Amino acid sequence: MPPGERRVSAEIGVPFLKIGTDDVGSLFRRRARKPLGPFLVLSVSSGLALDTALHTRHGTRAHLWRAHGQPHQLWLLGPTDRDGEFELVSAANNLLLDGRGAQDGDSVRMCDRHGADAAWQRWRVVAVDGGRAHRIENAGTGMVLDCPYEAVSPAPATLWAPHGGSNQTWVLAAPFTVAATG
C-alpha cells in the first residue's frame, strides 16, 4: 500500500454502539460543492454579455458581445477553498476568467486552472444597488470586471480599479430561450 493511502483505524465499543475512526472522519470530510449556474454575465451600462468569442485556447481575451444566451456566453461560479470567492468558469471551454492584470484597462483573459493558490483566478461577487446587481472583484488584484464606457459589440472585457460606476456593475441572469412561434 502506498504511504499516502495508509489508514489508521481505531474503534470504541460499548454495548449496542460501535464507533470507528472511519465513521467519525466522514462527518468532518468536506463535501464536493457543485458550481452555481450557468449564468449570463450582463453589463448594466451596455447590456453586453461576457463572451468567450468562441475561443478555446489558454490566454485568449474575454469579450463583451450582444446577449444571445449561447454556451460561449454562459459562466459558472465554481467553488474554491476560500469563503466568498469563486472561479468564473466558461461553460463552453472550461477556461477560468483570469484577472492577472494590474493596470487599468488590462484585458481579462481566459486561462487554464493554475491551482488553489492562484488568487488572480478567484473572484468575489459583491452585491450592489440593493442586491439587484453585482460588482465582480478579483481576489488577487482588487481590480474589478469593467465594461469600457460607450462599449458596442464586440468590446474587450477589461479590469479597472473600482470606482462604483455602472460600467462596473453586472447582472448574473439565468440563460434564456426564445419561444418558437408557429
Regions found by a protein language model. Name each.
Residues 7-182:
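Lectin-like carbohydrate-binding module/patch detector with strong preference for beta-trefoil
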